[in-house]
Amino acid sequence: MREYSKDETEYKAYVQSLKKSALTAFYTPEPLVAAMQESLQVSGSHPGRFLDPSAGTGMFISRLKDVPEIHCFEKDKLTGKILSSLYPESRVTIDGFQSIQPYYNNYFDMVSSNIPFGNTRVYDRDFDRSEDVVRKSSLAAVHNYFFLKGMDTLHEGGILAYITTSGVMDSPQNRPVREWLVNHANLVSAIRLPDNLFVDAGTEVSSDLIVLQKNT
């Protein structure tokens, strides 16, 4: 990695970025991506505007066909540069999802990703100043934030499909988030995934595939 960095400062920035993303990110197995895309196609979802808020190296967008407008966010600097090189036709932002502009509220047809999870705090000024208690509290856990922020970016009837920690569905402390989602979307499907799904990444985590349709 050092030999591809322009200087020592850039090299250190890459290393630090990788360390941070290692705490919350698990890259998506290709068969799962294929199954997700197939199920969305069967459901009749053909997005014109697609968003992956935690794109990694682009496993999700690699299977998109005939989608005119694809937006990706990737917080890790090195992974983001790889993503930009692999998919130059996509609009790649090398920054956290919280940096998305208000212009993109109610904008996308579909938001789909293997989102980061964990009790990592996110800073979003609009959420932090919100009078909605659930929006404000979602900042304390990155996966909860991704659900609410992702829903904001969808237009009415848009589809959100996330791979996420099973804690979203199971944890008592996430009940307010679940209730918020019920009040803002219809549940299309929720599937408990095998614990060994991410074994190639060196970990076993309990995760779910959750598909929602925005309905406010």
Residue ranges and their predicted role:
Residues 1-86, 90:
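Class I S-adenosyl-L-methionine
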Residues 75-77, 138-198, 209-211:
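Conserved Class I SAM-dependent methyltransferase catalytic core
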Residues 115-146:
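Mobile active-site "lid"/loop adjacent to the S-adenosyl-L-methionine
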Residues 89-97:
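Conserved SAM-binding strand-loop segment of SAM-dependent methyltransferases
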Residues 102-112:
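A short acidic, Gly/Pro-enriched loop at the edge of an enzyme's catalytic core
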Residues 204-216:
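Core SAM-dependent methyltransferase catalytic element
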Residues 12, 112-118, 163:
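Amphipathic alpha-helical repeat scaffolds
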Residues 47, 107-108, 187, 207:
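Local beta-strand N-terminus motif with an aromatic residue
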